[in-house]
Amino acid sequence: MTRFTRLALGLSGLIASASAAGLAFTFAAPASAAKPAPGRVFELRTYVALPGRLDALNTRFREHTLALFKKHGMENVVYTTPQDDKDGKADTLVYLLAHKSRDAAKESWTAFGNDPVWKTARDASEKDGKIVKSVTSVFLDPTDYSPMK
């Protein structure tokens, strides 16, 4: 399955999960990668776990990552997994973060990556081997008609 296909499937799963929860999201790609729009941005991230490691990934997020994201200024919006096997149910985590700006996102990710608490949690969660096979990230701007901005 290609990276684009996984991203599209992840986004469709996110939308389906949001719809089931009574939420409505509308996304648009940034106009220019070279010049990010000012203001709040969303980041859609898709993690593909190594075979049999999704539970370990979910545990790491549940017990450590969400709190660390918040500590470093990232807003946890929604965390989802696909419902169907063909969409990566066994190994895929898709989540949405909100950042004050694209620059703030960069600063938050740098601080998160350098946080000794994160390094300890990551190393402990990988004591039985690596967890993540791949990560994709897409920054999104809400449209002018999006109920969530």
Where are the model-predicted features located?
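N-terminal signal peptide c-region/cleavage motif recognized by signal peptidases
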Residues: S17, A28-A29
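Bacterial N-terminal signal peptides that target proteins for export
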Residues: M1-A21
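Short, low-complexity, Pro/Ser/Thr/Gly-rich segments in the mature regions of secreted, periplasmic
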Residues: D141-M148
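An amphipathic, aromatic/His-enriched active-site/gating alpha helix that lines ligand/cofactor pockets
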Residues: L11, F25, S32-P38, T59-V77, ...
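Active-site-flanking beta-strand signature of metal-NTP-handling nucleotidyl enzymes
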Residues: F42-T46, V94
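Short, solvent-exposed loop/turn elements at beta->coil junctions and helix N-caps
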Residues: T80-D85
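A short, glycine/Asx- and small/polar-enriched loop/turn
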Residues: D87-L93
